Structure formats: structure tokens, C-alpha cells
């Protein structure tokens, strides 16, 4: 291991993309301000484009002589295939939630965050593992760019619906119940796109439905109603889970919001 001084975010050249600069600024600051090298050992590493910079920043601490001994003992818990690769690519120790069910701190992104730090997650099809890791953590920190912040309710900026992980054989039943009982505007099964025929299959071998409820006034009540439907594994509504959120802006500044 060759040691290098920990790079300061202000010394980095631009990535050439204001959005990526915003994501990096949010992620680096979140790690710098919340990772406790004396108390934290089990670290949750989430999924998504902003979390790339979380893993990168922790990896930079690993290469710094001052922090190496402590960071080398961190065990990082992934939420999916992407985060597993991020952990390994940055030289960090890979663990599992089965081996380490009690997580000290977790970092993850979000598709939308409302004024109460309620979240929509699951656009990347990892919502069950993301919720398992984040709810197992003593501290859950959200990192995102400012497009993901809603000053009012969920469903304002994120227009793709609430991701819902379902048992494959129940897709028709759940789809019907979402539209007829819970009055979703639509509830399509997420498809794999041009590279894959048929539905997206999660890491848990389930399907996903993206249910459009428009603006969500009461995300906790909606989450509970969806969970009661037979065939639903988990929803992408993360309720009273996040402790703090970091939103990177294109000008390089970062807005920090704490749970009220």
C-alpha cells in the first residue's frame, strides 16, 4: 500500500460535468462529517451514481497514512451488485448483512427526498437490500444532487412512481389491487429494456412495479397500505429512516438537512 495525503475536495479539478461535481461534493462532505474512525466499524455502502463518490472517499482515507490502520478494519456492507464492486474497487473489505446485521453507519442515495426526509428509493432495482441495510444502521446518511430534493411532498420531482418489489407470481394481483384499491394512476411491471426481454428481476429474484400515485401527501400511510397487499415484498418508500441528507449543487455548494 502506497500512502498519499488525503485529498481535499477543494483541491480537486472539476469533473467536467456540474452534476457530477455536485454529487462528488455531497458524497465527500457526507463521509468527512459523519464517518467516525474510532467508533464506526461496519459501514453500509448503498447503490447509485452518487454513492460512487462515497466509496471513492472512503478509499482515499484508506490510502492516507493517518487513517489507514482504522479504515483497513472497516467492513463494508453492500446493497447490491454495483455497491459490491465499488467496495472492492476501492480496496475496502467486503462483508454481508447476514454476517453483520448491526451496521454502524450507512450511506446511500435517493430518487427523491421530501421536507421531512422521507424518501423514494428503488429506481436502481435494489430497494429491498437498500432498506435492509439502512434500517439496520444506527445512522443513515442520504447523499444526492439537488434535483432529488422536494421542498414539499414526494412525487413532485420523481415522476416514475413508487417502486414496489413483488413476488413474481403475484404481479397481476398486486397490479390490480394497486389501481383498484389504492387508486394508483398506473402500476406497470418494470421491464428490462432493449437489452433484456421481459421484466426486471431483482437480486432477490423478484419483480418490480412502479406505481404512480402522483403527489404523495402521507407517505407513511401509503407505505403501510401497500405493504398490506398480498404479494408485496417491500416498498420504495423509506419512512423515518434517514437521519441527515446532503444535496450537492452545480455551483459546488452542499445543502445539509437534518431530521426534524
Curated annotation (Swiss-Prot):
It comes from Candida glabrata (strain ATCC 2001 / BCRC 20586 / JCM 3761 / NBRC 0622 / NRRL Y-65 / CBS 138) (Yeast). This is Ribose-5-phosphate isomerase. It is found in: Cytoplasm. Keywords: Cytoplasm, Isomerase. The keyword Cytoplasm applies. Belongs to the ribose 5-phosphate isomerase family. Its EC number is 5.3.1.6. The keyword Isomerase applies. InterPro entries: NagB/RpiA_transferase-like (IPR037171), Ribose5P_isomerase_type_A (IPR004788). It holds the Pfam family Rib_5-P_isom_A. Pathway: Carbohydrate degradation; pentose phosphate pathway; D-ribose 5-phosphate from D-ribulose 5-phosphate (non-oxidative stage): step 1/1. It catalyses: aldehydo-D-ribose 5-phosphate = D-ribulose 5-phosphate. Gene3D superfamilies: 3.30.70.260, 3.40.50.1360. GO terms for cellular component: cytoplasm. It comes from the Eukaryota. SUPFAM superfamilies: D-ribose-5-phosphate isomerase (RpiA), lid domain (SSF75445), NagB/RpiA/CoA transferase-like (SSF100950). Disulfide bonds: none annotated. GO terms for biological process: D-ribose metabolic process; pentose-phosphate shunt, non-oxidative branch; pyridoxine biosynthetic process. It is an enzyme of class 5 (isomerase). Its main location: cytoplasm. One of its GO terms (molecular function) is ribose-5-phosphate isomerase activity.
Amino acid at each position: 500500500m502506497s500512502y498519499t495525503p488525503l485529498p481535499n475536495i477543494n483541491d480537486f479539478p472539476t469533473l467536467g460535468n456540474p452534476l457530477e461535481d455536485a454529487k462528488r461534493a455531497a458524497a465527500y462532505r457526507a463521509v468527512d462529517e459523519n464517518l467516525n474512525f474510532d467508533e464506526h466499524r461496519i459501514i453500509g455502502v448503498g447503490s447509485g451514481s452518487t454513492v460512487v463518490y462515497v466509496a471513492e472517499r472512503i478509499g482515499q482515507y484508506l490510502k492516507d497514512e493517518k487513517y489507514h490502520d482504522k479504515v483497513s478494519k472497516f467492513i463494508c456492507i453492500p446493497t447490491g451488485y454495483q455497491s459490491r464492486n465499488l467496495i472492492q474497487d476501492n480496496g475496502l473489505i467486503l462483508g454481508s448483512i447476514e454476517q453483520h446485521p448491526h451496521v454502524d453507519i450507512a450511506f446511500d442515495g435517493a430518487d427523491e427526498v421530501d421536507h421531512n426526509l422521507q424518501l423514494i428509493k428503488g429506481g436502481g432495482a435494489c430497494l429491498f437490500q437498500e432498506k435492509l441495510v439502512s434500517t439496520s444502521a444506527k445512522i443513515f446518511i442520504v447523499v444526492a444532487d439537488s434535483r432529488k430534493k422536494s421542498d414539499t411532498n414526494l412525487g413532485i420531482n420523481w415522476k416514475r412512481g413508487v417502486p414496489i418489489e413483488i413476488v413474481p407470481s403475484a404481479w397481476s394481483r398486486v397490479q390490480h389491487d394497486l389501481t383498484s384499491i389504492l387508486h394508483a394512476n398506473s402500476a406497470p411491471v418494470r421491464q428490462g429494456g432493449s437489452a433484456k426481454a421481459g421484466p426486471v428481476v431483482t437480486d432477490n429474484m423478484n419483480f418490480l412495479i412502479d406505481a404512480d400515485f402522483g403527489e404523495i401527501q402521507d407517505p407513511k400511510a401509503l407505505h403501510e397500505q401497500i405493504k398490506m397487499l398480498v404479494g408485496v415484498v417491500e416498498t420504495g418508500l423509506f419512512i423515518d429512516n434517514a437521519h441527515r441528507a446532503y444535496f450537492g449543487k452545480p455551483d459546488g455548494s452542499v445543502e445539509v438537512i437534518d431530521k426534524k
